[in-house]
């Protein structure tokens, strides 16, 4: 997805350099307050840096929403082992495409965030694990890292601050599973990308069995403005328990899809109607995925009064997730939507856990049966039963990611499965108004 023109309703903190000439260059970054946060952080104690991040109420932007400052504080202060900073840039969630833009248009912001994290936990080496399909972004990050080394922002005795930090890119091989933090670490170490048993967690036993800070690209990019302008200023942009802005990938049946930076707590309806330019052809909102394909699906009615933040989504029994919003209008076949989602998860299951490996395969086959007009009434209950028996029974969240949207679609759009029973064609397709999903 190309970068879209900004909306006047955006609050551009992490994306403020987007659209500037040569925005990825070090010269542009330095001309717009770049690396000033690192200079400030270098004069702070590790405890002060972590406390500022805690004050900001920054929560992980990769999907889980765990408080970042708390996560950093779990890293042991004194350890005989080296500590590592790892950036999760393995962005593979359907509907999510924000991290690629942050790396493409402002790579030095990510580098500075990783540097400050290194100061906070006394780490001197970091890895950016980038999705293998992001060849262009990998080249941009490598160029930015080379610029940072050439101008003394990486390497030995950075800017005379008596702080050393080495940073490397590591390319993934296209596995969605490696977006899960422990599978990512296994892959980083050259092993098969499958999840680890936890505890211990990466903060104590992470990369190469050493203490590790592991966060998402957007999370690290939020750190420089937090340190530069203060945690309280960042916190004020959001809601009480979650500070700042969130990059939202607005996709689906809207007139103006794109990546937008919005304050946490932004109204869903305003996002769709004003930021996204409304629903295609003036149709009604039927279904809404708030944070990527792994989130429970909400109906149009459930979006009334809903805001884009962690607590609001939890009350609606969904998740903010990674911010991959998918809007579906009234001509969407929800059976087909469920099948598209399940095809992805069945393909991407690493096969390590039987409930996920077998469950996603069976769900895909059952949904395909309905899509082909061969479903039976008993199959509807079987789909729900299979999905519910996957919840909480796998080493990583992929099993839940496949089950949650399926359960919500079956429960909320039960009648559409009935419409596909006993050889009946899809009513939307038959009427010639089937929307693409």
Which positions does each model-derived feature cover?
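Hydrophobic alpha-helical positions that pack around
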Residues: 138-264, 276
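Conserved phosphate/anionic-ligand binding catalytic regions in large, soluble enzymes, centered on
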Residues: 55-74, 117, 174-186, 190-191, ...
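Short amphipathic, charge-patterned alpha-helical segments
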Residues: 113-117, 264-282
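Short acidic, glycine/serine/threonine-rich loops at helix termini
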Residues: 64, 70-72, 96-99, 138-143, ...
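Cofactor-/ligand-binding subdomain signature composed of acidic, glycine-rich
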Residues: 1-52
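Gly-rich Lys/Arg/Thr-decorated short loops/hinges at beta-loop-alpha junctions or inter-strand turns
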Residues: 29-34, 88-99, 202-207, 249-254
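Ferredoxin-type iron-sulfur electron-transfer modules in oxidoreductases and energy-metabolism complexes
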Residues: 36-52, 81-83, 89, 98-103, ...
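Histidine-anchored nucleotide/phosphate-binding helix
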Residues: 106-120
